Amino acid sequence: MKNKVVVVTGVPGVGSTTSSQLAMDNLRKEGVNYKMVSFGSVMFEVAKEENLVSDRDQMRKMDPETQKRIQKMAGRKIAEMAKESPVAVDTHSTVSTPKGYLPGLPSWVLNELNPDLIIVVETTGDEILMRRMSDETRVRDLDTASTIEQHQFMNRCAAMSYGVLTGATVKIVQNRNGLLDQAVEELTNVLR
């Protein structure tokens, strides 16, 4: 029996992980128990086991063929988890690499996951830039508000393509500065 699979996406620094974790906390109180899975963490585990990286941020710099192989292995692992319970997959719709945008959910991953819903968490490029600059825990490439906006546009395009390929609905959720509670409430409602 197929359990519900939801994909939650957003550019680095938008707060998709934080807002979705808080929504999952709300849902647990209601007896709705998703398993939260970070696609990046599963990819990192696989890449680290293969001695390809030592920190998560290095994964963006792997050559595309290696990234594709790691994505496929991670997708297979998560698909196995989804057989046990509903799953929310925290990931990126696209990954900005030195050679261009890499789909975060290429066909071989989509075929494994077959999501029911794809959520894109967004805010303005300026807000994301400020969040990134104040986050000393991560090593991030320097971007401008304009390149962040372009990345978010690519995420929307990719999310709709994923929806076309799988029949999943696509939901855009705004996570503006100072309005986290609103984003969490919207996520909680759509995940019920």
From Swiss-Prot:
Q: Which GO terms describe its molecular function?
A: adenylate kinase activity; ATP binding
NCBIfam families, per database record:
PRK04040.1 (NF003122)
Cell compartment(s), UniProt: Cytoplasm
State the family named in the UniProt similarity comment for this chain: Belongs to the archaeal adenylate kinase family.
Q: What is its EC number?
A: 2.7.4.3
Q: How does activity depend on temperature?
A: Active from 30 to 40 degrees Celsius.
Q: Whose protein is this, by species? A: Methanococcus voltae
UniProt keyword annotation of Transport present: no
Give binding positions for ATP.
G10, V11, P12, G13, V14, G15, S16, T17, T18
One of the record's GO cellular component terms: cytoplasm
Mind telling me what this protein is named? Answer: Adenylate kinase
Q: Which UniProt keywords apply?
A: ATP-binding, Cytoplasm, Kinase, Nucleotide-binding, Transferase
What catalytic reaction does the record list? AMP + ATP = 2 ADP
Subunit-structure text: Monomer.
Return the InterPro entries for the record.
Adenylate_kinase_AdkA (IPR023477), P-loop_NTPase (IPR027417)
